[in-house]
């Protein structure tokens, strides 16, 4: 038995999909455990580029099981569209398994999400407006509708009818928007459920059986630690737990069955949406990183905010997710920058702090303390191993490992699978 969790160590968009896809080659099951179609990941497979939002990266390997876990919130319409997208490209999806306990996103969740973000104005969170937050709110309030409910028309109708009474009052009286009629949703969404019902099962059983049979299971996180609802920059966070601890809740696999946690970090830092960002760059270097790194959101197309590597952030990720390994991505984007900076601490009211503050008010006042390192000019996109990297690039990686306290076990120097390199296997048993 061997299991590996892949988590983002920053604010998402670290390249988790690429690393998950790479590690999937040696896995026999791949599972997502939180989030929904608010997070996109781009995967290159057999020369083709795919953009997925719900379905795990392992879907391209027909001999491997791909799991949408119970901790996810699933938009049935988006799922059907994503399945069609894959089928149109000739991808076999018969290896997909969808948890019967996962909650679903309905049109009223999306409308409420949009309206609430609009109402907040300058205080908006920066949500993707996909209905994720409202769906998780219903789950916590115990009025959510699960996939198992969607597949039973009578149960679905009963729960939907009950919820629409409350949601329509909220939409019409508070947001002054039009509500929904039962028939507007019932037939359409029941129909979506019927299109994917053959994939639905108890995925906790599937995953535990795989582990008990000695198979390798890979757990794929969405977003990143800094977007975790408990450990992130609250309230500028997602509505679930991307940290490694979220695996046990969102997949139905106990913590004793988790072996390694791989934190994926960009060689710099990016963020989409609002909230404090201590190392953010507003100069030509930041603009250059954004363009070379193609830093635009997979889901929204929004330009990402760009900054220097922040070891305070990744140390926080190491502690709250129990990172055993680090995968450093997009090193090639930094090529040609004469002097690189790494944030080693913050200055807050004249004092040096090395741990990430809980208070956003404090974080907004933090000034980064930088350490400068010489950059490199050599093209590194064709390197085949760690030893092939320029000395300055290796020193940069080594310093990141020292500052974060996590060994760099993988690194990537480009978007293709062949540009990801292993320093130490994360599938090791010890």
Swiss-Prot record:
Quote the record's binding site residues for GTP: 12-18, 40-42, 304, 330-332, 412-414
Task: Identify the main location.
Answer: cytoplasm
Query: Which pathway does this polypeptide act in?
Result: Purine metabolism; AMP biosynthesis via de novo pathway; AMP from IMP: step 1/2
Q: Which reaction does it catalyse?
A: IMP + L-aspartate + GTP = N(6)-(1,2-dicarboxyethyl)-AMP + GDP + phosphate + 2 H(+)
Q: Name one GO molecular function term.
A: magnesium ion binding
SMART domains named in the record: Adenylsucc_synt
Cellular component GO terms, alphabetical? cytoplasm
Where IMP binds, per the record, is at 13-16, 38-41, 128, 142, 223, 238, 302
Query: Catalytic site residues?
Result: 13 (proton acceptor), 41 (proton donor)
As cofactor, the record names: Mg(2+)
Quaternary data: Homodimer.
Q: What does this protein do?
A: Plays an important role in the de novo pathway of purine nucleotide biosynthesis. Catalyzes the first committed step in the biosynthesis of AMP from IMP.
Q: What is this protein called?
A: Adenylosuccinate synthetase
Originating species: Listeria welshimeri serovar 6b (strain ATCC 35897 / DSM 20650 / CCUG 15529 / CIP 8149 / NCTC 11857 / SLCC 5334 / V8)
In the UniProt record, the gene name given for this protein reads purA
């Amino acid at each position: 038995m061997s299991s590996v969790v892949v988590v983002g160590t920053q604010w998402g968009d670290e390249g988790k999909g690429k690393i998950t896809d790479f590690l999937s080659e040696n896995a026999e099951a791949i599972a997502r455990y939180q989030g929904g179609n608010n997070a996109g990941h781009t995967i290159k497979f057999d020369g083709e580029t795919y953009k997925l939002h719900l379905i795990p990266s392992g879907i391209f390997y027909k001999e491997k099981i791909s799991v949408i876990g119970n901790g996810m919130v699933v938009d049935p319409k988006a799922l059907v569209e994503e399945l069609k997208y894959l089928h149109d490209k000739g991808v076999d999806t018969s290896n997909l398994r969808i948890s019967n306990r996962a909650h679903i996103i309905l049109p009223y969740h999306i409308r409420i999400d949009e309206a609430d973000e609009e109402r907040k104005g300058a205080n908006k969170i920066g949500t993707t407006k996909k209905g994720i937050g409202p769906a998780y709110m219903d789950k916590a309030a115990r009025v959510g509708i699960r996939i198992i409910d969607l597949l039973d028309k009578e149960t679905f109708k009963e729960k939907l009818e009950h919820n629409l009474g409350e949601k329509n009052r909220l939409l019409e009286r508070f947001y002054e928007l039009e509500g929904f009629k039962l028939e507007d949703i019932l037939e359409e969404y029941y129909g979506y459920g019927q299109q994917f019902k053959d994939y639905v099962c108890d995925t906790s059983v599937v995953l535990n059986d795989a582990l008990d049979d000695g198979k390798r299971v890979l757990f794929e996180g969405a977003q990143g630690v800094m977007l975790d609802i408990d450990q992130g920059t609250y309230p500028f966070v997602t509505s679930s737990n991307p940290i490694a601890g979220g695996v046990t809740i969102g997949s139905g696999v106990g913590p004793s069955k988790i072996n390694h946690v791989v934190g994926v970090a960009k060689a710099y830092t990016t963020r989409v949406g609002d909230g404090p960002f201590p190392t953010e760059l507003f100069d030509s270097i930041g603009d250059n990183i954004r363009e070379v790194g193609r830093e635009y959101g997979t889901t929204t197309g929004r330009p990402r905010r760009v900054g220097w590597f922040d070891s305070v952030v990744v140390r926080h990720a190491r502690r709250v997710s129990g990172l055993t390994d680090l995968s450093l991505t997009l090193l090639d984007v930094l090529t040609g920058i004469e002097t690189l900076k790494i944030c080693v601490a913050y200055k807050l009211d004249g004092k040096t702090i090395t741990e990430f503050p809980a208070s956003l008010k404090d974080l907004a006042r933090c000034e980064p303390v930088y350490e400068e390192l010489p950059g490199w000019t050599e093209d590194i996109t064709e390197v085949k191993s760690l030893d092939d990297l320029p000395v300055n690039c290796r020193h940069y990686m080594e310093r990141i490992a020292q500052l974060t306290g996590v060994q760099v076990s993988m690194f990537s120097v480009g978007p293709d699978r062949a540009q990801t390199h292993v320093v130490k296997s994360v599938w090791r048993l010890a």
